[in-house]
A protein has these predicted regions:
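Short helix/strand-capping connector loops at secondary-structure junctions
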Residues: 263-278
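C-terminal accessory extensions/subdomains outside the catalytic/core fold
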Residues: 276-279, 283-299
Length: 300
C-alpha cells in the first residue's frame, strides 16, 4: 500500500496533532499524493530564467547576474554549453560570453537542463532510463522543430520538461513506481492505468500539477498533461511537436516502459507527413546516432 505523510495544513481542526490522519492533497479533479506535494520547489535560478525570458525588454546584464548569483549553477551551465550535448564550436568561459554567443533561448534550455539534473539527485537504473527518455525527447524536439516553425531551443525546453510528472513520482514514491516502470504493458494507456492504480494519479496529471505548483509557464502544464493523448485538432503547435517527439523517442530506442504495441518509426513520424511537403523526414538511424552521441555528455 502506498505510504503518505501528514500534511499539517490539511489536518482537521478537531484532531490533536498526535492523532492527525495521513492524507493526500485533493484538488477539484484529482487527488495528489502528499509526498509529491512535498517535493522541493523547482530550482529558483531556473525559474527566474524562465520568467525573465518572457520579457521582450529583458536586460542582459540582469539576466547574467541572476545566473551568476549561484556559482555552482553557472558552472554547470557552462559545462553543458561546452559539451557535446549542444555542440557549440567555441569554448565559453563566462556566463555573459555564453549569453552573447548562444542567445536567451539556448541559455534557457541549458538552465532547465541543469535544474532537471539537480532535481533528480540520486539515480538508479530506472531514474536513468526516465531521464534518458526525457533528454531524447528534447533532442528529437530540437531536430524536428523547423517542421513546426519553432526555434530548436524552445522545442528542446518543452521536450525536456514533458515527463517531469514521472520523474517527480519516481523521486517521491520510488517503492510504488519501480514495479510500475519495470512491468510490461500492451500500450501507454495501460501504463497510465497502472500508475493510477498504484498512486491514484498518473504522471501526466502529476506533471501538470507540479508545473502549476511551481508557477512555471502554463504551456509546460498542457504538454505534461496531454503528451500521451491522441492527436486532436485543438492541440497547440508546441503540444503537437512534443507528442510526435515523445513517440519518436520511444520508437528509436529510448522508451521508459516496454509496451507490446510500441509504435514503429514510420508510425511515429506519420503526424509529420502533412507538414513535410517535399522534404524528407529524418532517418531513424541518424536520429538515434545523434541522440546517443549527445546523451554521452551526461555521463561525463
Amino acid at each position: 500500500m502506498r505510504s503518505t505523510v501528514t500534511d499539517p495544513r490539511l489536518r482537521p481542526a478537531s484532531l490533536p496533532a498526535e492523532s492527525a490522519p495521513e492524507v493526500d492533497f485533493e484538488t477539484d479533479v484529482v487527488k495528489i499524493p502528499v509526498k509529491l506535494c512535498n517535493l522541493p520547489p523547482f530550482n529558483a535560478i531556473a525559474s527566474q530564467v524562465l520568467a525573465l525570458t518572457t520579457d521582450p525588454d529583458i536586460d542582459l546584464r540582469q539576466f547574467s547576474k541572476v545566473i551568476e548569483g549561484d556559482p555552482a549553477f553557472a558552472a554547470d551551465i557552462l559545462f553543458l554549453a561546452n559539451s557535446s550535448l549542444f555542440g557549440f564550436p567555441s569554448q565559453m568561459h563566462g556566463v555573459r560570453h555564453a549569453i552573447t554567443l548562444l542567445g536567451l533561448e539556448r541559455i534557457k534550455a541549458l538552465a532547465v537542463t541543469v535544474a532537471m539534473r539537480g532535481f533528480l539527485s540520486k539515480r538508479n537504473a530506472l531514474v536513468h532510463q526516465c531521464w534518458y527518455h526525457s533528454v531524447a525527447c528534447a533532442l528529437v524536439c530540437e531536430e524536428i522543430s523547423a517542421i513546426f516553425d519553432f526555434s530548436g531551443d524552445r522545442a528542446y525546453t518543452a521536450g525536456i520538461m514533458h515527463d517531469i510528472g514521472r520523474l517527480g513520482l519516481l523521486k517521491s514514491y520510488p517503492t510504488e513506481m519501480m514495479p510500475v516502470l519495470s512491468g510490461q504493458y500492451l500500450d501507454t494507456q495501460e501504463v497510465l492505468r497502472a500508475e493510477r492504480a498504484a498512486l491514484n494519479v498518473d504522471h501526466a496529471r502529476a506533471g501538470s500539477w507540479l508545473i502549476g505548483n511551481w508557477a512555471l509557464p502554463k504551456d509546460f502544464s498542457e504538454i505534461c498533461e496531454h503528451h500521451h493523448d491522441a492527436p486532436h485538432a485543438n492541440d497547440s503547435e508546441l503540444l503537437q511537436l512534443v507528442k510526435a517527439a515523445c513517440r519518436i523517442a520511444d520508437a528509436i530506442g529510448f522508451p521508459v516502459v516496454k509496451c507490446q504495441q510500441q509504435p514503429s518509426y514510420l508510425e511515429a513520424i506519420s503526424p509529420l507527413t502533412p507538414r513535410l511537403g517535399r522534404k524528407a523526414a529524418p532517418l531513424a538511424e541518424d536520429l538515434y546516432a545523434n541522440v546517443t552521441a549527445r546523451l554521452a555528455a551526461f555521463d561525463r
